[in-house]
């Protein structure tokens, strides 16, 4: 089975003085997270779409889904965790409460504040996760990447053609991700905050899927301005 996990656990501190968490801010008159949910509903192979949000915003999320007539039976809203990976584990636990997982079950995890993902990106994530077990969505690094050990001087300038910027979705065979996460020590869990990095550190393959430059993450007021420019430009979603 194929599951979607929409990660909406953040409060958006980098967005500044705003009345709502960033995922609920309006983008062309509609909450960002609603744009994202609509994109997931366009991909018809999902058996369940699980939205993980702070507990105090669960009822608000339900109200939004009702207001925008997205009260689809396959959508479920649960409480997120203390961090990204904890939120993903909460989603997996929610699935396990009513389904027995098998080795081929897949979860597509995605930032709620990336509303411009495409069907192609989702489709390739699912296809490659079925084949390789784990997938990360990336775009080529446009700028030269600088590494500094002390934030004062350059330590290294990696070869740009080998550098990529990570996006989401990140997609996994569920049992493999869960088993990998549970194998970590508490200190490792605190350091390895990216799910793909857990698998990489354990020596497991993570396949790359080409993202899109417009698949941006909306975390600052500037990002929101860029997102409004993208959406008014009628960027195609294939």
From Swiss-Prot:
Database matches in InterPro entries: IspD/TarI (IPR034683), IspD/TarI_cytidylyltransf_bact (IPR050088), ISPD_synthase_CS (IPR018294), Nucleotide-diphossugar_trans (IPR029044), TarI (IPR034709)
Keywords noted in UniProt: Cell wall biogenesis/degradation, Nucleotidyltransferase, Teichoic acid biosynthesis, Transferase
Pathway membership, UniProt: Cell wall biogenesis; poly(ribitol phosphate) teichoic acid biosynthesis
Binding site for CTP: 7-10, 81-87
Family: Belongs to the IspD/TarI cytidylyltransferase family. TarI subfamily.
Known function: Catalyzes the transfer of the cytidylyl group of CTP to D-ribitol 5-phosphate.
Protein name in the entry: Ribitol-5-phosphate cytidylyltransferase
Protein species of origin: Staphylococcus epidermidis (strain ATCC 35984 / DSM 28319 / BCRC 17069 / CCUG 31568 / BM 3577 / RP62A)
